[in-house]
Regions:
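Alpha-helical membrane insertion/targeting regions
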Residues: 1-169
Length: 169
């Protein structure tokens, strides 16, 4: 399968799988109640790894940049697996805040969700360009991918911090 077909397939499959998780019945597994916290840790770690990867490439340290991006991708895959497993085993938690904080929460959540769906193909395309040593186009799309990936990673942590007081566990 070529890169374009794989990127398109994953870009359609992942958001569809996440959507399905919200409509299927859940099975209870209290032993994985720690997953939202773990997901926030993973998101925060990805955020900092991406910053270090950016700093590395700016200093001309291509190998370090490559290793850091592989780490960010690996952690993002781990996050996705953990996220899917958590939402397959737990119902969504309603935000119970009021006033301005409620609007802020939903703004952050909605932008996070939309950009999380958008960032998947962008990350895959950016990675694909680098793996094929098409560094000019890689750099061009990375200028858009990096800030969006940073935003999604950071807002993942913020969403967790805002919703965590309402978890029943």
């Amino acid at each position: 399968m070529n890169h374009k077909k794989l990127i398109l397939s994953l870009s359609l499959l992942l958001p569809t799988a996440v959507f399905i998780l919200y409509i299927i019945p859940k099975f209870n597994m209290e032993t994985v109640d720690f997953l939202p916290f773990l997901n926030a840790i993973i998101n925060g770690t990805v955020f900092f790894i991406l910053i270090f990867a950016f700093m590395a490439i700016k200093k001309g340290k291509r190998e370090l940049h490559k290793k850091l991006i592989y780490a960010a991708l690996s952690l993002s895959i781990l996050f996705l697996l953990s996220y899917v497993f958590h939402h397959a085993t737990h119902d969504s938690v309603a935000f119970a805040g009021a006033g301005l904080v409620k609007y802020l929460y939903y703004f952050v959540l909605i932008t996070h969700i939309i950009l999380a769906a958008i960032i998947v193909p962008m990350v895959l395309i950016t990675f694909s360009r680098a793996s094929k040593e098409e560094f000019k186009t890689h750099k061009s799309i990375a200028r858009l991918t990096l800030p969006l990936w940073l935003y999604v990673s950071l807002t993942g942590v913020i969403v967790y911090l805002m919703i965590s007081p309402y978890y029943p566990y």
